[in-house]
């Protein structure tokens, strides 16, 4: 039985196994407090995210189960990876992942990014999205603060707590407003992997400009700011709007012409402008895909089609429509955690045999 130690962080009890030391608060992630710590087994620094009271409601239990399943399934260099998971005696759940020194939000608020960094970061975002989308997963909440970066400029996408299946009836109030695709704001249903491309486009623009591209004060203002730059959406996009109120609002807006992005991004390369134009398209079906973006001229310095993997298998979303009591989610969660540790132990055994230990 693992030995647990307690520490108080921001008035919150962290109850972790004695394998981890030197707890330091890092910040709040989606639905939990995050600390850095030293993993005494591997001698590496790690991030530990506490999911508070995961079994307090069926909704929270399901959300935690979903995040755990996603972290276990997604294995890619540009996606955050799970290194440990445990349930404490107080029945809080702790996810342990690799620790990266900073995130894109902090980088963007500290100094302008040079061209080669913008290219390399965008390349890694697109490489990660190609993999995630191939697994049948939509992130839904892509923004600078959940794109982690280390001192070698390695980039990893994190916070998959909101991620959902590619589902034709998706419902909507998800990502942080500035980075939210128009189809989430307008239709409240029917969206897919393209929402992540829009968000990545907003992040790309922010890397080029040093400030958010569409800093809306609310939903209405947000959409208005988007149309000032990109013009009025085409009729075939407007006609997909399901809500009568939203449709009335969009039709009441003055007709606007799309502005050339080169006028706004005066210092950007023509190839950067071209890629951005293809990402920020109202019609999701006409938006560039992650795979297409990787092959775009702007990302040529880093593009390697032999090293941009897709998922070996689709993520199993069969649990996602289940409406189960907390106790059932708890049993399923314990089962997933046991499976994770058994798989890890098996891998370690294979490593030991391979190295002759």
UniProtKB/Swiss-Prot annotation:
Which residues are listed for ATP binding in this entry? Answer: 26-34, 49
Query: Which residues are responsible for catalysis?
Result: 141
Principal cellular location given in the protein's record: cytoplasm
Pfam families to which the protein is assigned, alphabetical: Pkinase (PF00069)
Cite the record's note on assembly: Interacts with the HOG1 pathway downstream tanscription factor MSN2.
Name the family the entry cites.
Belongs to the protein kinase superfamily. Ser/Thr protein kinase family. MAP kinase subfamily. HOG1 sub-subfamily.
Task: Tell me what this protein is called.
Answer: Mitogen-activated protein kinase HOG1
Gene that specifies this protein? HOG1
């Amino acid at each position: 039985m693992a030995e647990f130690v307690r520490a108080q962080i921001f008035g919150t009890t962290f109850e972790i196994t004695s394998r981890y030391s030197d707890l330091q608060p890092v910040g709040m992630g989606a639905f939990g407090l995050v600390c850095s710590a030293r993993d005494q087994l591997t001698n590496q620094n790690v991030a530990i995210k506490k999911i508070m009271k995961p079994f307090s409601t069926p909704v929270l239990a399901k959300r935690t189960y979903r995040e755990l399943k996603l972290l276990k399934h997604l294995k890619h260099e540009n996606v955050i990876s799970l290194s440990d998971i445990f349930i404490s005696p107080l029945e809080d759940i702790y996810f342990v992942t690799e620790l990266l020194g900073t995130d894109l939000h902090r980088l963007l608020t500290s100094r302008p990014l040079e061209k080669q960094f913008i290219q390399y970061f965008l390349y890694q975002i697109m490489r990660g999205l190609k993999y995630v989308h191939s697994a049948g997963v939509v992130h839904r909440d892509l923004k600078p603060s959940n794109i982690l970066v280390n001192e070698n400029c390695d980039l990893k996408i994190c916070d998959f707590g909101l991620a959902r299946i590619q589902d034709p009836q998706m419902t909507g109030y998800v990502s942080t407003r500035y980075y939210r695709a128009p189809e989430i704001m307008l239709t409240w249903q029917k969206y897919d992997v393209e929402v992540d491309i829009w968000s990545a486009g907003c992040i790309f623009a922010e890397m080029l400009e040093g400030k958010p591209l569409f800093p809306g004060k609310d939903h209405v203002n947000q959409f208005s700011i988007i149309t000032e730059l990109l013009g009025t959406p085409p009729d075939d996009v407007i006609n997909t709007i399901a809500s009568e109120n939203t449709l009335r609002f969009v039709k009441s807006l003055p007709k606007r012409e799309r502005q050339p992005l080169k006028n706004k991004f005066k210092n950007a390369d023509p190839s950067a402008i071209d890629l951005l134009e293809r990402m920020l398209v109202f019609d999701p079906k006409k938006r560039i895909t992650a795979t297409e973006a990787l092959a775009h001229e702007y990302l040529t310095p880093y593009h390697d089609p032999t090293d941009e993997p897709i998922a070996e298998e689709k993520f199993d979303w069969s649990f996602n429509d289940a409406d189960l009591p907390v106790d059932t989610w708890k049993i399923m969660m314990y089962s997933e955690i046991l499976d994770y540790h058994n798989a890890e132990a098996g891998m370690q055994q294979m490593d030991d045999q391979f190295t002759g230990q």
